[in-house]
Structures are given as C-alpha cells and as structure tokens.
C-alpha cells in the first residue's frame, strides 16, 4: 500500500510543479507572490478542515512557537517560485529537491541524529549529483539553443545567476525542515505544527 501512496505523491508533486511553472509569468513581477498566496490559502483551508473534522484541541500559542519554521517554508516557496520565471522546470526542480539531503546533514550535525557511513555518503552523493545535473542540463540547453540558432527567451538569459533561486530554495527549505526537527525534539506535537 505504501508504494501506491508513494506513486500518488510523486504524481501530485510533479503536477503541482507544472502548475507552479505555468503560473510563473516572467512578464508579471508579482506572479510568484500570487502563487505563494494561493498555496497559503489552500493550506489554511486544510488547517480549518483538520480543526473542524479531527477533534484535535488546538493550542493557539503553538502558532507563535511555529512561526519561525513557517516563515522559512514561506520564504523558500517565494524564492523557488520566483526562480521559475527564469529557469526551466527540469533545471530548477532537481536542485530544489536536494533540500531533503541537506536537511538530513543538518539534523545529523546539529541535532545528533544518527547516520551510518553509507547513509552519509548517499546524502552527499545525492546533493552533489542533483546540483551538477541541473548545472550540466542548463549548459546543454543553452548550447542546443545556440546550435539551433533559436532566439533565447529573455527569461532564460540569466544563466548561472538564475541558479541562485533554486539553490536558495534548497538551503532555506532545508533550514525549515531542520527547524521542524528541532521544534519536534522540543516536544511540539506534529498535528499542532501541521495546523500552525
């Protein structure tokens, strides 16, 4: 059953990425903020649904406790969506999704989580591989456009500077995940954090 849920999650994640890319209009300098607001609205609706249907007794003080973590996640989304205006999804998405490996390293280093040598090697390999994949893919895409004498879309002319957006997303999102682990280690219930 877990495999079915994993497949559904991957499909939903990929579909969401396509909608984020479609909504990132390079001509609208605020398009990424509109996406952040819509994602926040959907998450707020989800929180209200959970509150109304699950019988959880929510403690509002947890909203203040969890605010720095939420701020990191919101900032990472804004940076990631802003970057979609300048990069192809096939370049930005792998870099952004390396945040899980980075947060694994952070929890290992700072929170004393255990990690075997092989796990440590795998996390490092994934992180380096994902970043190199996007760098090489961008170079190949630029070379292909030049070879085919295609006009380079204005939004893709920023090159290496545009890679700062998905890298920024990965770093900020990994800090958010690390902060999640830290808050949970200090005793906050996951459901309280989810609603916050």
What feature does the model see in each segment?
Residues 51-63, 108, 112-117, 177-192:
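Membrane-interface helix termini and inter-helical loops of multi-pass transporters
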Residues 28-38, 88-99, 122-123, 159-168:
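Cytoplasmic-side transmembrane-helix entry/capping segments in multi-pass membrane proteins
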Residues 15-42, 56, 172-196:
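Juxtamembrane helix-loop-helix junctions in multi-pass membrane proteins
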Residues 15-28, 74-91, 131-141:
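C-terminal ends of transmembrane helices
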Residues 68-73, 81-133, 192-196:
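Specific alpha-helical transmembrane segments that line the substrate/conduction pathway
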Residues 2-9, 48-51, 55-79, 158-171:
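Loop-to-transmembrane-helix transition segments
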């Amino acid at each position: 059953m877990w495999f079915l849920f994993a497949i559904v999650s991957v499909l939903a994640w990929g579909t969401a990425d396509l909608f984020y890319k479609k909504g990132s209009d390079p001509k609208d300098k605020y398009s990424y903020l509109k996406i952040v607001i819509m994602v926040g609205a959907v998450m707020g609706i989800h929180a209200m649904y959970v509150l109304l249907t699950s019988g959880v007794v929510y403690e509002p003080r947890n909203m203040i406790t969890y605010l720095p973590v939420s701020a990191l996640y919101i900032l990472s989304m804004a940076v990631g969506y802003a970057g979609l205006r300048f990069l192809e999804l096939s370049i930005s998405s792998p870099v952004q999704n390396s945040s899980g490996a980075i947060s694994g390293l952070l929890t290992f280093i700072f929170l004393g989580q255990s990690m075997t040598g092989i796990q440590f090697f795998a996390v490092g390999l994934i992180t380096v591989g994902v970043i190199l994949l996007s760098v090489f893919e961008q170079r190949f895409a630029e070379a292909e456009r030049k070879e085919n004498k295609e006009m380079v879309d204005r939004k893709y002319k920023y090159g290496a500077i545009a890679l700062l957006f998905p890298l920024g997303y990965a770093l900020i999102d990994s800090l958010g995940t690390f902060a999640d682990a830290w808050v949970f280690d200090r005793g906050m219930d996951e459901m309280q954090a989810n609603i916050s």
